Amino acid sequence: MKVTFLGHAVVLIEGKKNIIIDPFISGNPVCPVKLEDLPKIDYILVTHGHGDHLGDAVEIAKKNDATVISNYEICHYLGKKGVKTHAMHIGGSYLFDFGRVKMTPAVHGSGILDGDSMIYGGNPSGFLITIEGKKIYHAGDTGLTREMELLAEENVDVAFLPIGGNFVMDVEDAVRAAVMIKPKKVVPMHYGTWELIFADVELFKKKVEEKGVECVILEPGESLEL
């Protein structure tokens, strides 16, 4: 199974089924691919309604007849646009044909900007994905939260954590999160897309590895095998 970081918070999982998380491709200044470069996508996971995460979900879903997995409010919004959806809520889990997905808490917003209006997008979340015997945690956009301690029992293989500050955890809080989660590997995300969320990723790697957690820095387009 290949897991590819496509910049910002976009993660592509290629296995028996292909899954993309927070598909912000168009307009993403650090994404190295275009929509037409993506493989066939079976499922799209959306952590919250902000444009840099909801991204190109509608176009990708319609092109591939893919199913969007997100909270009820986002799924309702997308369903009105003719998209296939599977609605969940925080704490809920479901066994799909590729594996199990559990929605985890996140501390953030989730409004959907639609023209001049901001539509209620439910609660933001992360995802704990169990697939082909491996566990992947994608935190979404979030501040540090005590609920992350519960993930230590999950034996997470790789955790994608935001480190860019301002809207999400900064380096120091992301290190604390990694210590609580205890993943085998941590991959930093949601940094450097714009100047406002610049972070010293090498400092994060140094500090988190001092705490005993292996850090893998993936440049946009780079992958790891699980």
Swiss-Prot record:
Keyword field contains Hydrolase: yes
UniProt-listed Pfam families: Lactamase_B_2
This protein's record includes keyword Ubl conjugation: no
Listed GO MF terms: hydrolase activity
Keywords, in A-Z order: Hydrolase
Similarity comment: Belongs to the UPF0173 family.
HAMAP family listed in its UniProt record: UPF0173
Record's protein name: UPF0173 metal-dependent hydrolase TRQ2_1653
Organism per entry: Thermotoga sp. (strain RQ2)
